Amino acid sequence: AARSLAQALGRKADNLFIAGLLHDIGRLLMVVVAPDDYARVIATAREQDCPLQQAEMSAFGYDHADVGAALAQRWNFPEDIRQALAFHHAPSGGTPGGPAGLIHYADAIAKALDLDGAEDTQLPHLDPATIDALDLDQHTLARVLAETQEGFDHCSLLLG
């Protein structure tokens, strides 16, 4: 979704594609470091019908975006990737039309198409400033949705 969206907006897609792949890497680290605690976070999110990041904050005092941003900083990732990982759930913390906003929107597209396989069953709230900043028309959005689904289907065939 991130690559298709970046291309549709005339942005350089390489780092945005990488940011899209890595935007939830903090979640992976949290699962690896504290699997039992994270299983409880997932259960809490389901029981309370709340976003996973809200349940993460309640349980840990930080969320996967914070962990991902810390990893990106430690690994000396470019600033646009760090911003995307840090603010993909709250793009107004960065620049709504910037990398975080684009990943925020791409994440919503992946969730809407049910491509993410996430335990989180809620569609993310799209940040209004991001919607305004990216200014996608219906035709472009339809094309991005179709390209994203097609790309996912192609990768699924390749990976079996």
Can you annotate each of these PLM segments?
Residues R3, Q7-G160:
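Metal-dependent nucleotide-binding catalytic modules
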